[in-house]
Amino acid sequence: MAIKKMTDLNLAGKRVLIREDLNVPVKDGKVSSDARIRASLPTIKAAKDAGAKVMLMSHLGRPEEGVYDEASSMKPVAEHLGTLLGQEVRLIKDYLDGVEVADGEVVLFENVRFNKGEKKDNEELARQYAALCDIYVMDAFGTAHRAQASTHGVARFAPEACAGPLLAAELEALGKALDNPAKPVVAIVGGSKVSTKLDVLNALEKVCDQIIVGGGIANTFLAAAGHPVGKSLCEHDLIDTAKDIASRVEIPLPVDVVVASEFAETATATTKNISDVSDDDMILDVGPETAGQFAELLKNAKTILWNGPVGVFEFDQFGNGTKALAQAIAESDAFSLAGGGDTVAAVDKYGVADKISYISTGGGAFLEFVEGKTLPAVAVLEERGD
């Protein structure tokens, strides 16, 4: 079913309610990282320039639901957004009974989590949101996996419900990487535990030619292949599961690794052949030979899906593997999609953001989409798309 797009609708003079993900870090009353606000700017500007009465809603932090808490107020976001837009953005605290907004004006509603019933997708609250608008725009992919009143319920009852440009672009990029990808497809799945990425691995094996595993996940696959992993993070109870996955899809394993005797920023890094790992070693990165082999695989790929680093890149001496892969992806002609908090941090650290085809804004939503799960906020837009 086709989802309506905001860009296809006439917004002039309409009350347009946009759910954005403006959940940004705030320090001393100021926004300390505005990536999410900047990501939402094109949507907000498009609605404003079309002459809509623009109303924005988002959550911020994890306040107790139904209780106003100044520490989780959207006030710093309204101020920062006003600076970026070059016009005042009014913060409206009490809006559920209706608000007056001028054509071309942008207002921001106070934190949706201050409303009782938001997280439980309360129907009465959803209907109150819906009554505020002529058109509801869902543009927050990062919250699309949660059925809440501001992401799901409101879309059921609004006169018209559609996807904003940010959400539409996200779904298009994910579809391109997963539905009918150009082959060969190589995925990088990093992270500390196989258990948290099991559904991802099971879903990816159906579309991938190879899956490069990294971090603690790789240690479990190394142990499953009979290699020593010393005192590395490893899920020994999932060794049979790892063997099972490796029997169904090609999982290239490290031939050399970077080890240390402790997990610390000051730890000394030593490169070893995989067969030389001792009982006292912790594997904290892939070695240079492995990084080169993985880079070669990425060079030949037509589609690359990246979720998770292959080493403890936060410590520079264990970041070379992730850096080498980031650079290989940047130099590749493949369609590349990166997603997940740690991955985005690595993309930023190694300065390759402009060389990746698409960087997903969603953490949990990105993973659930890759796993093939239905995202409630997307499903309701499909239902309303007819």
Curated annotation (Swiss-Prot):
Does the record bear Cytoplasm in its keywords?
yes
Q: Which domain of life is it from?
A: Bacteria
Record's GO cellular component terms: cytosol
**UniProt pathway:** Carbohydrate degradation; glycolysis; pyruvate from D-glyceraldehyde 3-phosphate: step 2/5
Residues given in the record as substrate binding sites: D21, L22, N23, R36, H59, L60, G61, R62, R113, R146
One Pfam match, by short name? PGK
* Binding, ATP: K197, E314, G340, G341, D342, T343
* EC number(s) reported in the record: 2.7.2.3
Q: Which GO molecular function terms does the record list?
A: ADP binding; ATP binding; phosphoglycerate kinase activity
Reaction equation(s) it catalyzes: (2R)-3-phosphoglycerate + ATP = (2R)-3-phospho-glyceroyl phosphate + ADP
GO annotation, biological process: gluconeogenesis; glycolytic process
Quaternary structure, from the entry: Monomer.
Record-stated family: Belongs to the phosphoglycerate kinase family.
Protein name, entry field? Phosphoglycerate kinase
Source gene?
Answer: pgk
